[in-house]
């Protein structure tokens, strides 16, 4: 009797219970869009965000007779990524046609690489939250072209199911991609979700450092597919895997792996068949939902593209590219940690929060390292959490944060007023100085007004005055609070404390 096919159920297994029975095996596939000016096989612009179907040409539309021409810079950047991932670079690689029908694929095949990728057998060492280092082995990194983009209309969740119409934008068709595929990641156990997140984070940092991609997961220039299967503890045979597609944030990577472990475990203990399929990650509740059956390699009918010659990468050219590699992110982190005098856990907090580059840019814009860290890791991290976005997705720049810090140092803003200024920038009210002026946030400089507020607060709190004069100097906080309330937070606390001490001496 055939086991029932499992789609989705809220009856997932408790995560700790999963680990008692099963070991997870993961595989990560990450697509990185290269930031070249033109497409991989034609001269059309690869600019993101242009009007739909404005960056198209006969080749990216798959018109009869159109012939592809390889973008040399795309090949160079593919080699650069391979070298940074400690891969072997193939002296000769080939493009192949991956055949499948989908409306966003005008040619009905995708130019990719199959059995002769440009880079293979590498690794990337990643650091987990507690400082543990984990080596993720790379199977291959290969070149291919991106597909177009579909916009589904009429459905409840923007997906094709339930849609009444679909719009095709071919601007993205032909944009150069590098797909980076890991070898099976085994032995991670309870840390599998964390390892997946750390790997994607490290890979994102790497390609950004290389200058080959902005790696914006929210815009699709870096897209993550996670493959996962479970096997009983103590066994070695792989289970049936599922592939969760197009995960678009680090948090979602972790949640998708965790949920799929719990879902598959519930299937296995209830004798429900796990189908090899693609699944969609649901941002709203952190679950995955059924997609389509997963094709095998044979289904794609790969064959060498007859319109494209082999890609040759002589050793001399590879070494020239190697010489252009920038400081790697892990080396840069060690240097910054030493220069700023940070403890290991302080540096990990910066990296785990996705704040390191933002803090570095804020320091370069004029802020002190401790000021920049404080803003990004505490207050702005809280704002990002409230909005459900990553730090880099906030509508404030490092230059603006540095300006806020400067105004605090100049005594023109208190910390409380500075936070209000930041809130205004995040709300789209303008640049820092515009928000300060529009909201009237600058610290009050009228000595007479502040002194009057101090006198009023002292008169209203004779018991505090008495305690102070009896030797308890810590009671002035209530007086300072009253003055700040009277001045709507615009008085300089240091000036207020000086006035209080002077009047009570």
From Swiss-Prot:
Alphabetized PROSITE patterns for the sequence: GATB
Keywords, sorted A to Z: ATP-binding, Ligase, Nucleotide-binding, Protein biosynthesis
Molecular function (Gene Ontology), one example: glutaminyl-tRNA synthase (glutamine-hydrolyzing) activity
Classification via InterPro entries: Asn/Gln-tRNA_amidoTrfase_suB/E (IPR017959), Asn/Gln-tRNA_Trfase_suB/E_cat (IPR006075), Asn/Gln_amidotransferase (IPR018027), Asn/Gln_tRNA_amidoTrase-B-like (IPR003789), GatB (IPR004413), GatB_Yqey_C_2 (IPR023168), Gln-tRNA_amidoTrfase_suB_CS (IPR017958), Gln_synth/guanido_kin_cat_dom (IPR014746)
EC code: 6.3.5.-
A Pfam family of this chain: GatB_Yqey
Catalytic activity, as annotated: L-glutamyl-tRNA(Gln) + L-glutamine + ATP + H2O = L-glutaminyl-tRNA(Gln) + L-glutamate + ADP + phosphate + H(+); L-aspartyl-tRNA(Asn) + L-glutamine + ATP + H2O = L-asparaginyl-tRNA(Asn) + L-glutamate + ADP + phosphate + 2 H(+)
Coiled coil residues, start to end: none
Classification via SMART domains: GatB_Yqey
Gene Ontology annotations of biological process type: glutaminyl-tRNAGln biosynthesis via transamidation; translation
Family of the protein in this entry: Belongs to the GatB/GatE family. GatB subfamily.
Subunit structure: Heterotrimer of A, B and C subunits.
Reported function: Allows the formation of correctly charged Asn-tRNA(Asn) or Gln-tRNA(Gln) through the transamidation of misacylated Asp-tRNA(Asn) or Glu-tRNA(Gln) in organisms which lack either or both of asparaginyl-tRNA or glutaminyl-tRNA synthetases. The reaction takes place in the presence of glutamine and ATP through an activated phospho-Asp-tRNA(Asn) or phospho-Glu-tRNA(Gln).
Name of the protein: Aspartyl/glutamyl-tRNA(Asn/Gln) amidotransferase subunit B
Native organism taxonomy: Bacteria, Bacillati, Actinomycetota, Actinomycetes, Mycobacteriales
